[in-house]
Amino acid sequence: MQTLKAKYNEQVRPALMQQFGYSSIMAVPRIEKIVINEGLGSSKDDSKAIDKAAKELALITLQKPVITKAKKSISNFKLRQGMPVGVKVTLRGERMYVFLEKLINIGLPRIRDFRGINPNSFDGRGNYNLGIKEQLIFPEITYDMVDKVRGMDITIVTTAKTDEEARALLQAMGLPFRK
């Protein structure tokens, strides 16, 4: 089976070039990066929860996550400036394609009642946002490892100028959009 990067170069790029009539191969949209963010919400007071979330995200993405900190103090949320509020990873290059392949072929099919991803989650600039409710859909995370089920936000940043181009790119890459 060919990798996602090879599929992009050999099949997706020429198809998009023909579909949208690009004059240069460099004008064809490509995936720039994937950002995975896991906000911890109520467990922000527990430092072990942050370490656990970082460890799980590192297992899933094969890259050490960055701990995100609060920018401002908000008294209603009992939040102080500089307190850790989540973890995030930015994937580029080969790791990005490996993660996307894992998400498409293993992760998404394991979601309960999965009928495809929402086609309306584009941001108007060619980027796609996807929310996942539990980290158990990835094979690296076993049920015994999980102390609390956490979700994550996945942002796929593309070089596409419009949502239509980005959707064509992601659909050609194999993301299963809902009809």
Curated annotation (Swiss-Prot):
NCBIfam families: PRK00010.1. This is Large ribosomal subunit protein uL5. One of its GO terms (molecular function) is rRNA binding. The keyword Iron does not apply. The keyword RNA-binding applies. It comes from Deinococcus geothermalis (strain DSM 11300 / CIP 105573 / AG-3a). GO terms for biological process: translation. GO terms for cellular component: ribonucleoprotein complex; ribosome. This is one of the proteins that bind and probably mediate the attachment of the 5S RNA into the large ribosomal subunit, where it forms part of the central protuberance. In the 70S ribosome it contacts protein S13 of the 30S subunit (bridge B1b), connecting the 2 subunits; this bridge is implicated in subunit movement. Contacts the P site tRNA; the 5S rRNA and some of its associated proteins might help stabilize positioning of ribosome-bound tRNAs. Part of the 50S ribosomal subunit; part of the 5S rRNA/L5/L18/L25 subcomplex. Contacts the 5S rRNA and the P site tRNA. Forms a bridge to the 30S subunit in the 70S ribosome. It comes from the Bacteria. Belongs to the universal ribosomal protein uL5 family. Gene3D superfamilies: 3.30.1440.10. Keywords: Ribonucleoprotein, Ribosomal protein, RNA-binding, rRNA-binding, tRNA-binding.
